[in-house]
Amino acid sequence: NRVRRRGVATIRGMMALAVAALAVTALTVPSTSEAGMQRFQWQNRPLLVFAPDGDDPALQRQLGIADSHAAGWRARDMVTIVVAGDRPVTVDGTRAKDLVNDALRQRYRVTGDSFAAILVGKDGTEKLRHDAPISADKLFRTIDAMPMRRREMREREG
């Protein structure tokens, strides 16, 4: 019986530690709203592109993909959010005063010296992440497989 009680106490202690760790994480990682991303929820599918600076070759390649597939971007309600170096954040090339570089880097856990392309769904959750540019084909296949996108396509057809 004593062994069983010790085991239960250990499990309770581990659970308390896990809850405390989650609470600390919740306090240190900005939420979607704190990072300024709530304005896109249920409206757009953001592709966040993080780069060490604006001249980063991977950033330029990802922007080229977006430009050359603009019709597909629009059809899927996509926007491109660029977080490059310490420059102001842009949405589709326009400065976004409500989006803060550091808050986005912290929210999506991307360091200042790395490249990352992150697709966020209309529900505000991360759908795809790569440390290299993502092809339009991969982005479109990922989005087109989403239940919300399928519903949108059916509604546009009917």
Question: Where are the predicted features?
Answer:
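Non-catalytic interaction/Regulatory regions outside core domains
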Residues: V3-G158
